[in-house]
Regions:
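N-terminal acidic leader/helix
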Residues: 2-34
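Generic structural concept
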Residues: 8-11, 34-41, 67, 71-74
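Acidic, low-complexity, intrinsically disordered interaction modules
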Residues: 26-65
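Non-transmembrane amphipathic alpha-helical segments
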Residues: 14-21, 40, 47, 77
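Generic detector of bulky aromatic hydrophobic side chains
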Residues: 1-2, 9-15, 40, 58-61, ...
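Amphipathic alpha-helical binding modules
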Residues: 17, 55-81
Length: 81
C-alpha cells in the first residue's frame, strides 16, 4: 500500500514543477526541472512510480514526452489524494 504522505509529497513537488515548466520560456530552466524530476522519480517508491507510470520505464525521464508525462503524473496523483 502506498503511504498517503508519499502521494501528497509527490503531488506537491510535481505539481509545483509542472506549473513552472509549462509557463517557462527558458530552456535551461526546463532542463533543470527535467533533471530534478528524473532524480525524484529514481528515488520514488517503486509502488508509487508503477502506479503513475503505466508501466513505462522511461516515464518522467524522456525529454520528448516530459511535458505530457508530468501533466499525466499530476492528474493521477491528484486523483489518488
Amino acid at each position: 500500500m502506498i503511504a498517503k504522505d508519499s502521494i501528497e509529497t509527490a503531488y506537491s513537488f510535481l505539481h509545483q514543477k509542472q506549473r513552472i515548466y509549462v509557463h517557462s520560456t527558458l530552456d535551461w530552466q526546463k532542463d533543470d526541472i527535467e533533471l530534478a524530476i528524473s532524480d525524484y522519480a529514481n528515488d520514488m517508491s517503486q509502488e508509487l512510480y508503477d502506479a503513475i507510470s503505466g508501466g513505462r520505464a522511461d516515464f518522467l525521464r524522456d525529454h520528448k514526452r516530459f511535458q505530457e508525462d508530468i501533466t499525466k503524473a499530476v492528474e493521477i496523483l491528484e486523483k489518488m489524494l
